[in-house]
Amino acid sequence: MATVLMINASDRLEQGVSVKMYNQFLNSYKEAHPNDTVEELNLFAEKLPYYGNTAITGQYKKAQGVELTGEEKEIVETIERYQEQFLNADKVVFAFPLWNFTVPAPLITYLSYLAQAGKTFRYTETGPVGLVGSKEVALLNARGGVYSNEEMAALEMAANLVRTTMAFWGITQPVEVIIEGHNAAPDQADAIISEGLENVKKAAVAF
């Protein structure tokens, strides 16, 4: 039995294509792997505190054995709770849209919680080394425009951001399913989304 962490990074629960991808993957995975444990995490619903001075100072003080303020202690414990959940999962699925060239803010915050030396990577004399390379990861991304061509590729900072972050942590071959172009070609949107969701289903069964 595997533990699978399903992460939804969109609050467009009725209209969002990445949410449709999330739901398709979730249902198909459960059907194909009935004995696995699935944990769901909706990042917008979690209302994650921003990763800023309080969090950074609190983590530094804890590492140095210095007493934390109440506010620092609260956010450090929050960060550690999400770290533990991620690290304990055998498989992790990220479902997220591209909004204004990048990912929604809660996903940035969540990745910041996880991107901690000694947790997901460590420093060595020859450079940083990922610590979670054995974890299986799937990336489900929806983007209304077409960013797979050379002209637009440099503007794609959603899938590329998450993919690069995973690689830094040692996860170099995530499963990826991308649905793109449904807003750019509305007359083809249904077909584009339908084909993409079929690819999501296949990925879930094989994951």
Curated annotation (Swiss-Prot):
Gene from which this protein is expressed: azoR
NCBIfam families: PRK13556.1
E.C. number(s) listed in UniProt: 1.6.5.-, 1.7.1.17
Family affiliation: Belongs to the azoreductase type 1 family.
Keyword terms: Flavoprotein, FMN, NAD, Oxidoreductase
Protein name: FMN-dependent NADH:quinone oxidoreductase
Cofactor: how bound: Binds 1 FMN per subunit.
UniProt subunit comment: Homodimer.
Residues the entry annotates as binding FMN: 10
Function: Quinone reductase that provides resistance to thiol-specific stress caused by electrophilic quinones.
InterPro entries per the UniProt record, alphabetical: Flavodoxin_fold, Flavoprotein-like_sf, FMN-dep_NADH:Q_OxRdtase_AzoR1, NADH:quinone_OxRdtase_FMN_depd
Record's keyword annotation contains Transmembrane: no
